[in-house]
């Protein structure tokens, strides 16, 4: 299994729609202002956060149960940024829609710009033949409110191509997060 380069990422996105919309360059400025970079890097792709957020709230005093998740645990926000309360959590989704080839697995790592501020971005691997918008998880580990910017980079996706095709892909087993179109809450 080997990591794939910018040339491969560009070809797979332009010819097969692996990433849509696809940015072939590394974008570091918008409207003359510095932003948190996104787009193609040497051996990965920096994904952006869309303007759709779900922020944890305790107004209903429920228990967080991944097998029986109550959507009332979140407040939905659509804005160009999201303020995550201290020691709290938010979900978002990517701007980009992904179509992962059958012989590819991705690993996604949060950008250091956010990590250095105590904001942890978690994304599970994109499995072979998974497709959809990626649900992003943000943890604010600080005692202060933390800001996430929509339309800017939040994490880097690394693509690994296997030497052989898997017997059963995510699509084959009807994965529960297949084809997600928005911020998707836990499913058991």
UniProtKB/Swiss-Prot annotation:
GO terms for molecular function: dCTP deaminase activity; nucleotide binding. The keyword Hydrolase applies. It catalyses: dCTP + H2O + H(+) = dUTP + NH4(+). The keyword Cell membrane does not apply. Belongs to the dCTP deaminase family. PANTHER family: DCTP DEAMINASE (PTHR42680:SF3). This is dCTP deaminase. The gene is dcd.
């Amino acid at each position: 299994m080997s990591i794939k380069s910018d040339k491969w990422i560009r070809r797979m996105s332009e010819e097969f729609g692996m990433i849509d919309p696809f940015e072939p360059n590394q974008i570091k400025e918008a409207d003359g202002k510095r932003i948190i970079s996104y787009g193609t890097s040497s051996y990965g792709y920096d994904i952006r956060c869309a303007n759709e957020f779900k922020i944890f709230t305790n107004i209903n005093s429920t228990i967080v149960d991944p097998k029986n998740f109550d959507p009332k645990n979140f407040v939905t926000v659509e804005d160009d940024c999201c303020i995550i309360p201290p020691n709290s959590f938010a979900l978002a989704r990517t701007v980009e829609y992904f179509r992962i080839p059958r012989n590819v697995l991705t690993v996604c790592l949060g950008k250091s710009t956010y990590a250095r501020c105590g904001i942890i971005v978690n994304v599970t691997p994109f499995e072979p033949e998974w497709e959809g918008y990626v649900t992003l998880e943000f943890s604010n580990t600080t005692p202060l409110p933390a800001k996430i910017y929509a339309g800017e980079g939040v994490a880097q996706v690394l693509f690994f191509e296997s030497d052989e095709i898997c017997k059963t892909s995510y699509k084959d087993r009807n994965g529960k997060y297949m084809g997600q179109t928005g911020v998707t809450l836990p499913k058991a």
